[in-house]
Amino acid sequence: MKLKYNKLLVSVVIVTFVTFGLLLAECFGKSIDYQEKSIFPSFVSQGFFETRTNNEEYIIEKIAQTQENGVDMRSTLHFTQHGYLLNNISNLKIKFRQKTYTLNDVCFKPHITIFQQSSSSDQNEYPHYIQRLLLEMQRLSPCLIVTPLNCFYDIYRIHGEISNWNKNTDFLNRRLRNSYIEAIGENDERPYVKSNYGPSLIKSWADHMFDLPSKSFTNSTKDALFQKIKLWLLSIEPRQKTCAASIHSCDTPLDSEHYFNICTDMQSVDNFAEKKTKFKLEDVDEEFAMNLDCVDDQEQFIEWMQELEIRKMYSHVTEKPDYPNVVNQTCDKIFHDLNSTGIEFFDGSRSFSSTKSQFDTMQTEIVLLTPEMLLSAMQHSDFVNGFESIWTIEKAEELIHEFRLALKEETEKFKENRMSKMIRVTSRVLDNTVTTKLQSFSEKQTIHFVVNVHSLIVILFTIFVWSGAPLRSAFMFFVRDALTCLLFCFVCSTDGVIVLDTELIKYIIVLTLANLYFTTRSSFCTERLSRCIQREKRFPINSNFASLITVDTMTDSRQIQYFLSTVTKYQAAQDSYSNELFERFPKNWGCTSILIFPIVFVYWYFIDSNFDKICVSVLPSFCLAAGEELFAKNMFWKEREAMQAKQRLENEEQAESITGSSLEKLFAGNKPVSNTDKANIVKKSSIIRNQKPCLQDLSPGTYDVSNFMKYPHQASRIFREKIIGLYLRILKLRTLGVILCIPAILLIVISIGLLFIPVKRETLHTDSKQDDIFIEFEIFNFSTNWKIVNQNLKQFSEDIESIGTLYTISNWQKSFERFEQETNKNASAEWNILFKWINDEPINSAVTLFSEKSSGNQTIANPFKFRLRYGFDAKNETTVIEIVQKIDELLSKCSKNLSPKAVGVLYEHYHRIAVVWNLFAFNQLTTAGIFIILLSIITFIFAITPTIKATFLFSLLVVGTQIEVAALVHLFSLDHHQIYTNLALFAGFLAAWDPFCALLRYRRRILYKSETRRTPELASKRRVLLPIVATADIAQFFVLLITAFSILAIICSIVPELNIFFVPTVILIVIQIVAVFNSIIVSIATKQMFESEVRHYLHRDLRGSTTAVRVYNLVQKQRLASSLDEPQVELDEFSIKRSSPPCRYYAPPPKYSCKKRSRSSDEDEDSDPNQPGPSNRRSPKTGNKRVRGNGDNTELYIPNRYELIVSGKSVGGNTSAAWNGPGSTLEQNMNALEECFELGVDEYDFDEHDGDEGCELVQDMLDRERNLMNKRSTAQRRESRNIEKMKKSQENLDKEKSEEKISESKKNQDDSIESPNLPGTPANLPVDEPLPPVGRLYIVEHVLPEEYRRDPLTEPPSMEDCIRAHSDPNLPPHPRADQYPASFTRPMVEYCEDIYWTHRTGQLPPGLQVPRRPYDYYHITERTPPPEDLNWVPPAESPPIPIPQQAFDLLEERRRNHREQQDEAREGDLSDPEV
């Protein structure tokens, strides 16, 4: 963990120096007189985006109803449906500040202009009862609605609903009556007025009120006002009664009650023929008409009537109008003047438009008040009511906004009803904003939007990525955010001000990506290292090949999943805990790193002057993430050292062998406690207590090893498995790297060509008012004396006037110079003269704008804005482009001393088209060249021995992401193009760096073996499995990020206020997709570049598959040429200790045949008992032993026992077998056997005269067991005889011999099958090997029938069987020996690791004690799964957890495949001629 070998710390130091070097260079570039007054900067809004607002006298909401089939909507059916829509809008109510408002409160009412001819001061002088009368008339005035129903009488019903002409008349009458009583007093007579129509009440009370005498109300004024009231009453009266959709008469409203009356009339007619004639029904309507229920089918009946235009049958009551002729004229109706002439604004053709046909769209315009007009109306209402007005312009704007949203919701709701779907009419609110005035998007809304996006992404990553420690990761994410914002505010403010613009959004996006990436990296590192520590396993830390595990990609997917569950932890542990200085820096890396500074400075100075702010946005997150990762590694390293020290002390204290009672205590779980254990028990218990179980427990019947994958969230685990499976499939394609790399490079070349293709963009139609160009200077807190500012402005004015094609409209600087020459007598009073000039010439305030004056004598107000106005002499496109280019050069020249900004229609249009896009291509190519060099240097320093081809390909494809996005931005002429390309470059680097470094690290581990201590065991016939952890991490990161931005894009497309963010969000999604695609190409192409090197290394250096093969080849080379004819040295004769034991369950079981067993047993019966037969080996599928006696004619089947051969004779079959020493008991001999098993057979010899008594006891035991097995052996012999009668004895004998040879070869082959990550198991001794010499103890395995095999899930193991099966001194240590004390032998460990203990599901038998548990019992992260039981039958009762049907289908498919394989193998054996 030294600094010079830690690349993470070195990268942090380099990034820090680069960042602060750029900041220091920027400070030197500023004026030396610059002095910062405020410690914390201020924020100034310059507008993030530009939107259009309405500039008319009132707000118009347009509603369009379109017939999808293009049918002419001038019909009864569509007018009726349109009337229902307006009826719903008229009853629309919203809740605003604990009060209810309707359309009548916010709509514009043109009739009230009749009373606005006099001034407001005159109206305030009216008596209170007159003011009350005028206020109520204003409330009853109809709203301005432009609709085709204005041509019909139906509009009066709608206005009656909106203005409450027929509702709340009692309340209206009471208000007018109270104002009248207040005027006349208590003693006068009170008139009685009663009416259900609001305008009638106005007329009646107006007659009474104007009869009252008033001193302030003269007769002339009274008469004039009374005439206006009559005019108002006349203006709202209808002129003719033409109904759009009448039922009985025009006065009948179109509501459900009248439809209900019609339904009642239809239901009263029982005869369908009469009903059909009277109501003009069709044949298809018979079922509906006869089964009609007016209560239950009310809504369906109304819609059915509208579809069939059932109102035609009432044509005798009201004449059907000519709809095309009526609606094409001037349809004012309620809106007309005194002469009854129509107003042009209400022309009928205005209400129709065309999409598919001429009249398939019906339009309605509802006019609303502006916030200013609404504020005035509300204040006047509060004044008349005697309330203190609380209305402000902000509240008025909020009320208008809420009502417009409610109007859109109501329209959308109406569009989804059943009637609209039947007649296929779509209703929507049109966007009718007038593009006359530009207004910046609210910075408050933008800040809220950014915060919500931040929160959305953090929530998704917390759930799906940071599942190991979600709260801790989220907390560190926000800590990095806070520190970055704090540093940005201090070092990136311009003159103490941070401008809220699109550049700030770019820095926020860069911060978000970097912070998410570093937080994810830290979370993964900490989680994986903690799992390695929890296992307390001794990793091979002295080797760099801990993670070099090979697996055949064509093997079972479950084996691949099992391998993947360990490779992540092993690789993380190897990278962190390796003692070797593997990732060392290349030579001269210090000198090479110095080149980074001038390259970055060139890019900052000539290309992007804001690159220092990008570095500031990344620096805090990078530093904190690096520190967090190093701290975690150091902490886990110390914890690991403590565990290893503890294990060494335990091994030293328990080195002596445990026998007798100590052995019983040990297997009972009572471990001897030492002083060291007492000292460390507190620490170990705290470690285990703080750790959570990482894996799910496997049930005894399951074989799904994917549950071992340590990803707590199921979706994340499944996704990573899919990504890894796809990656493994891609690795099989040898030419895929070339197939993908060539098109990727061609796409970059094509993108470069697209940057120079002239794209036709929109042309601009201008008038004389759009020819002006304004040069503005915004100087925020510019603390210099006025003389320097004036000199800079004077120089700029001279430079811009040197452009000959511009003429000056206003130049405040020249005006000030003339004023200064006339009044300036003292050179020290220049600042005071400026303020005097501003105050004396107020006309200049339109040119010079400022908000407040500073108190000091040497400072300028904040903000202080200067404006110079010029005009274009020539308006042709070529001249304007040349002027724009000259202005851009002048603005860039003065950007250091001033902050000039050019605005204007012509300038902005041609600047975007001509200047920006022409310079954009050269800018991107220059940026690409600089970053290719920079990324190559970074790769050379921080990667592991990169090749030239791989480095160039990585740099090219990372920069290719930027070029491809730049071409896309160029083709679509998108704004903020520089922001998109910078983000593309940053995202491309993040997506490709980790997988690229992992590939290079893997390459060095394979090819640079001289720097390691061991040789990796790799199979030359299998493809090398590349590191896939980094690829899966990057895929999970970017897929979730793309998902978050996709959700954001959907929200932006739905919410109208966020539509302006839709296009930037889509561009960000495209950037991430392109970055991930190029990252995949980098990984595949880089892998195939050095794959040939790896294959050459395997064939040339290893010369085979394993280390043992390599040793054997070396021995063969050293043999003399003269001894080549001697017998070859067998590989199994070398005493080569394997690195780790083979896997027990990955080798498939041998094919088993019942016929073989029956023939074998019959042959044994008929054979000569005195003739010695071959000793069969133990089959992997059977656990019983068959013992043959040398002096007996019977076979003994002893379950779970081995035959002991002492002095060349079988103990189980010969009663006269001699034991070592006369008079020795069985217990003494068994103790001797145990001592022999502990010391090894080479260190203990038996005497052939010992053990007579022990042999007798053993013989008695065998006799008893022989009697118990007599019946079964007899039945088996009878069955064998029946089979042999069908064939000749000689053929059976030959066939049996051939089958024995085939089974023997299959056993040898099965024994040598390799596990997924280990070399082959050495073969056992040959079958025909002679018996060993006298005086040695050997174990001979025999085959027992299938019926006597122990069920490891229900029957406990036998200690004697473990001792007999695992006491061979040639066996390697048990693979789980490191989880038990050092004194535990292999049989003891095997007994403790039996499946009965590790997968126990039931209760223990009485008297049986559980053996000692391993060290990692409570936090074991991987366990060898049990073999799959294809004969498993589910229990009859229902399981506690529902099992899907797909699981049972999969089980049946496996069983069927297994049976087919067995049948094919059996048929192959029968068809073999040798058999």
From Swiss-Prot:
Amino acid composition bias (Basic and acidic residues), ranges on this chain: 1276-1310, 1451-1469
Residues flagged as site, Cleavage: 1088-1089
Mode of membrane association: Multi-pass membrane protein
Biased composition (Basic residues): 1178-1188
Keywords: Developmental protein, Differentiation, Membrane, Receptor, Sexual differentiation, Signal, Spermatogenesis, Transmembrane, Transmembrane helix
The keyword Heme is assigned to this record: no
Record region (Interaction with fem-3): 1133-1273
InterPro entries listed in its UniProt record: Ce-Tra-2 (IPR032848)
Modification note: Undergoes cleavage by tra-3 to produce a feminizing carboxy-terminal isoform Tra-2B.
GO CC list: cytoplasm; membrane; nucleus; perinuclear region of cytoplasm; plasma membrane
Protein name (database record): Sex-determining transformer protein 2
UniProt source species: Caenorhabditis elegans
